[in-house]
């Protein structure tokens, strides 16, 4: 069986996207890469920012409980902190904290600030049941006063030149406290607010309620970034129109199509064949920090999402669907012995 590079490059299908598009986002506006626990780690951030079109990344969350974390915890989750808080492509990375204790979050933010992050983001949006049961993420949206206390404490704890932003959903079980939470975040001194246009109960089920972001944007005096269910250029157009925002945050959509930010900007986008070296680069990167038993799963997770956009990703996924052995994945997809045992 021919490896990925050979077999797929022989079957490159015409791209359904025009190579040059009318920009959906003014050139002076920005596109952010979302934090996604278990998916968008530093390896995938590296790949996606190499493709281009991203202005700012936000890391997956760093869980803060009742302890002052050592700096190595921050740099393990956000190794870009050792590179001027930027990816290899030079894109700034903000580090995200998640917790419910204002004092402990402030203490950890102060320590994180010693590593000079491009910014500190606060997570009020994670819908994961495990996180919510431990009073973290979107469940905090039931307590706007606590949300305010957290943002205010972190803002006081870090130097003024380090931005403190927040990411929230429309609410926990419903959106009744949506504006109260937005006001809590704004009045506490946040520099920016990202809004995922669904509640915690909505999870990731479509649709996203972009029009609700417009209500938030009209109610607060700080920049608001729209997030949620943007998979295509048309989605981006609709999101911008309905939310009234001029800045987008992309999550699963750009994992499925790493060139989505370029397409939204109306720039030339790479073919599947041009993405193949980046897929191999990702595989080599995860070999350095993901255990062998989970390594194939990480690659299949990405290929599974890419199947939405690229027929060739379906071929690649099928090649490795039944194996979790890194050496076999290496041989099937890249046609060379594994670089790591």
Give the ranges of each region predicted by the language model:
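Alpha/beta catalytic cores of nucleotide-metabolism and tRNA/nucleoside-modifying enzymes
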Residues: 3-32, 37, 43, 156-159, ...
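Glycine-rich, positively charged N-terminal anion/phosphate-binding segment
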Residues: 11-12, 17-21, 36-111
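Active-site beta-loop-alpha junctions enriched in small/polar residues
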Residues: 36-38, 62-64, 98-100, 125-127, ...
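Short acidic/polar active-site loop segments enriched in Thr and Asp
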Residues: 54-55, 118, 191, 246
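Conserved beta-strand positions in the central sheet of alpha/beta enzyme cores
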Residues: 57-58, 96, 121, 194, ...
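Conserved residues at the C-terminal ends of beta-strands
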Residues: 60, 123, 196, 244, ...
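Short glycine-enriched, charge-decorated loop/helix-capping segments at active-site entrances
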Residues: 72, 135-141, 265-268
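Alpha/beta enzyme core
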Residues: 109-120, 124-130, 134, 146-222
């Amino acid at each position: 069986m021919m490896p990925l590079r050979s077999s797929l490059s022989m079957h490159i299908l015409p791209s359904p996207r025009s190579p040059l598009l009318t920009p959906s986002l003014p050139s002076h506006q920005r596109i952010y890469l979302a934090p996604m626990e278990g998916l968008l780690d530093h390896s995938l951030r590296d790949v996606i920012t190499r493709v281009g079109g991203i202005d700012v990344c936000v890391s997956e969350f760093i869980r803060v409980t009742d302890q002052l974390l050592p700096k190595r915890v921050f740099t393990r989750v956000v190794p870009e902190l050792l590179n001027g808080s930027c990816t290899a492509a030079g894109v700034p990375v903000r580090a995200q904290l998640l917790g419910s204790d204002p004092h402990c979050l402030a203490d950890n933010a102060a320590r994180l600030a010693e590593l000079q992050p491009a910014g500190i983001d606060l997570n009020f949006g994670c819908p994961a049941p495990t996180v919510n049961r431990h009073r973290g993420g979107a469940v905090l949206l039931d307590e706007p006063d606590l949300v305010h206390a957290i943002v205010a404490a972190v803002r006081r704890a870090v130097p003024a030149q380090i931005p403190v932003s927040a990411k929230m959903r429309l609410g926990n079980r419903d959106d009744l406290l949506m504006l109260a939470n937005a006001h809590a975040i704004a009045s506490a001194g946040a520099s920016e607010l990202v809004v995922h246009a669904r509640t915690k109960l909505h999870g990731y089920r479509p649709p996203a309620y972009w029009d609700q972001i417009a209500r938030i944007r009209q109610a607060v005096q700080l920049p608001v970034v729209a997030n949620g269910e943007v998979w295509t250029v048309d989605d981006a157009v609709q999101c911008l129109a309905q939310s009234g925002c001029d800045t987008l945050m992309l999550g699963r959509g750009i994992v499925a199509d790493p060139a989505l930010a370029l397409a939204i900007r109306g720039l030339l986008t790479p073919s599947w064949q041009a993405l193949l070296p980046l897929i191999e680069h990702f595989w080599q990167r995860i070999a350095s920090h993901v255990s062998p038993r989970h390594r194939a799963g990480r690659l299949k997770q990405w290929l599974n999402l890419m199947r939405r956009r690229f027929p060739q990703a379906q071929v690649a996924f099928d090649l490795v669907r039944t194996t979790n052995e890194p050496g076999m994945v290496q041989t099937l997809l890249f046609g060379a012995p594994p670089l790591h045992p």
